């Protein structure tokens, strides 16, 4: 896959965070029926869930759930979209996956092309703010594509999942046309060094 260059911008303002929109590493939640239907491989890890209804002005469906998976050997991503509410859940799948390998998880914000607003997609502690929680949101980071790094004529992909681990970031990319068709089979993954 062609590598895309990014630039990172620190964002100090942490207002208007929607901390319930996503669960990222540490306490993933996955619907039992979905888990059984996917036949996940031993190397394919569930890393995040997004509740579309809890994200302000999402560029993807306004309801339903997005589940992010990544094969840690081939680095091939899989994103599954369903409108079914995960009433029955599995809390501890992929327990051996240790985020500490990548350093401290970092909360990230992202910006979509042509829009001024940013949306929060990652949270290092899904229980942050709840009684007994020891988690902190950390510094937010705005991740932007450097348009100059894209070949002429290539459509700029949208990012709809950015996850930070200390000195690097995992970024999920999707072409705008695929997103409009709700076709999540054409998702790309890149690893970006800070």
State each model region's role:
Residues 1-194:
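Preference for intrinsically disordered or flexible, low-complexity segments
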């Amino acid at each position: 896959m062609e590598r895309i260059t990014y630039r990172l911008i620190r964002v100090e303002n942490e207002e208007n965070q929607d901390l319930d929109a996503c669960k990222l590493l540490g306490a993933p939640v996955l619907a039992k029926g979905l888990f059984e239907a996917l036949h996940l491989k031993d190397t394919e890890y569930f890393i995040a869930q997004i509740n579309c209804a809890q994200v302000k002005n999402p560029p993807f469906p306004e309801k339903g759930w997005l589940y992010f998976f990544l094969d840690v050997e081939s680095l091939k991503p899989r994103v599954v979209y369903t409108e079914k509410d995960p009433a029955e859940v599995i809390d501890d799948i992929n327990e051996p996956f240790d985020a500490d390998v990548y350093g401290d998880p970092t909360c990230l914000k992202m910006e979509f092309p042509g829009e001024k607003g940013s949306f929060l997609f990652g949270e290092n502690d899904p229980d942050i703010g709840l009684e007994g929680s020891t988690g902190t949101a950390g510094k937010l980071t705005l991740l932007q594509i450097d348009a100059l790094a894209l070949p002429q004529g290539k459509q700029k992909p949208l990012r709809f999942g950015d996850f930070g681990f200390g000195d690097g970031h995992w970024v999920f990319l999707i072409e705008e046309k695929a997103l409009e068709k709700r076709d999540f089979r054409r998702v790309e993954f890149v690893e970006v060094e800070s």
